[in-house]
Amino acid sequence: MDVGSKEVLMESPPDYSAAPRGRFGIPCCPVHLKRLLIVVVVVVLIVVVIVGALLMGLHMSQKHTEMVLEMSIGAPEAQQRLALSEHLVTTATFSIGSTGLVVYDYQQLLIAYKPAPGTCCYIMKIAPESIPSLEALTRKVHNFQMECSLQAKPAVPTSKLGQAEGRDAGSAPSGGDPAFLGMAVSTLCGEVPLYYI
């Protein structure tokens, strides 16, 4: 053996692996397709991150709106329940804690408030462009109750609906038949005295 053959044996053995060392390779794919695949994966990841951030922001915004609505109604124990009529989608019902029940009838353009003891019912006509909030409605009913207690004016029962002529504050709505109130308001108020505010 001569010296030249020793040098050949000292070299590292040939590499028979499918992929080159230190590189990720996809067999039988050209380089430009590999780059395109990497770009597509990066774009999909960016879109997923953006959509996730938007959904998280929407969730936070919804929670904030619900919290503000609950705080505007009153105390934390105030519960609000919205029930939409399945047929006409014109009635909204709100339960204000244990203090009373409010029905917004958008078809008849009326709001009815019945306090918890259920001794009377307050009805208010609304304009479609200016629907009062629950807080404004309860304030108006409270002010009306204060005026009535100062005047000691008796309630006008539903049997006297036909006798009431005007729609002054404290009078019952005109019309002999309480059917003009609509089914939701008539169901809420029943046979208790009605006050038009």
Swiss-Prot record:
GO CC terms in record: alveolar lamellar body; clathrin-coated endocytic vesicle; endoplasmic reticulum membrane; extracellular region; extracellular space; lamellar body; multivesicular body lumen
Residues lipid-modified (S-palmitoyl cysteine): 28-29
Function: Pulmonary surfactant associated proteins promote alveolar stability by lowering the surface tension at the air-liquid interface in the peripheral air spaces.
Biological process, per Gene Ontology: respiratory gaseous exchange by respiratory system
The keyword Secreted is assigned to this record: yes
SMART domains: BRICHOS, SF_P
Highest taxon of source: Eukaryota
Major subcellular site: secreted
Keyword Lipoprotein: yes
Additional free-text comment from the UniProt record: Pulmonary surfactant consists of 90% lipid and 10% protein. There are 4 surfactant-associated proteins: 2 collagenous, carbohydrate-binding glycoproteins (SP-A and SP-D) and 2 small hydrophobic proteins (SP-B and SP-C).
Annotated localization: Secreted, Extracellular space, Surface film
Name of this chain's protein: Surfactant protein C
Disulfide bonds: 120-148, 121-189
The BRICHOS domain, residue ranges: 94-197
